[in-house]
């Protein structure tokens, strides 16, 4: 019995030492967080050049419907946004839990992955419907070096679908 207890104790210690703990470090003011802040300032100013520079040539863009696109298709989609909307504003929606009001954070994971996430509100005026639109969104960006390699969007795309439909009706 004594040998059994010692064996179980040794096995427990051995296996618990091998337990890998994955974790991440969250930053609210690092370089990548600032770059995403600048990204949305560029969107408000319709500065497509900044986006072309920040996103990797190997970008995989995943839209709210789960469809994947490459960088050229992503840039074409942003240009369409500029064509369909005016007075685009991105506002913090103060979803922070730390009281800072920050809606952008970057997490550096122990696996080596780095993701920046934004929780915000989009507002604009539709050029074809004339509608004032506003909705909350969440976007996650995966980094490879100082380039965004993956963008994943989470929001209801109905506003964009309605504006695109109005645009297509007028062009018939």
Give the label of every model feature segment:
Residues 4-14:
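Sec-dependent N-terminal signal peptides
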Residues 17-49, 53, 170-172:
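Short, low-complexity N-terminal intrinsically disordered segments enriched in polar/charged residues
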Residues 39, 50-52, 59, 74, ...:
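Hydrophobic pocket/interface hotspot
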Residues 48-49, 53, 57-114:
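A solvent-exposed, acidic/Ser-Thr-rich amphipathic alpha-helical stretch
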Residues 66-68, 123-125, 155-158:
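Solvent-exposed loop/turn segments at secondary-structure junctions
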Residues 111-147, 152:
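Exposed beta-sheet edge and beta->alpha loop/turn motif
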Residues 149-172:
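Low-complexity, intrinsically disordered terminal/linker segments enriched in charged
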């Amino acid at each position: 019995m004594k040998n059994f207890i010692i064996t179980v104790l040794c096995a427990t210690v051995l296996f618990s030492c091998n337990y890998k703990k994955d974790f991440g470090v969250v930053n609210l003011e690092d370089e990548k967080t600032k770059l995403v802040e600048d990204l949305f300032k560029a969107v408000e100013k319709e500065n497509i050049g900044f986006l072309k520079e920040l996103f990797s040539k190997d970008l995989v863009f995943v839209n709210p419907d789960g469809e994947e696109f490459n960088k050229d298709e992503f840039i074409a989609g942003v240009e369409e946004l500029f064509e369909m909307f005016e007075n685009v504003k991105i506002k913090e929606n103060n979803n922070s839990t730390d009281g800072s009001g920050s809606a952008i954070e970057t997490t550096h994971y122990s696996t080596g992955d780095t993701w920046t996430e934004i929780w915000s509100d989009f507002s604009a005026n539709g050029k074809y419907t004339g509608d004032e639109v506003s909705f909350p969104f969440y976007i996650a960006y995966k980094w490879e070096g100082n380039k965004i390699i993956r963008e994943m969007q989470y929001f209801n795309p109905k506003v964009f679908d309605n504006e695109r439909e109005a645009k297509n009706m007028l062009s018939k």
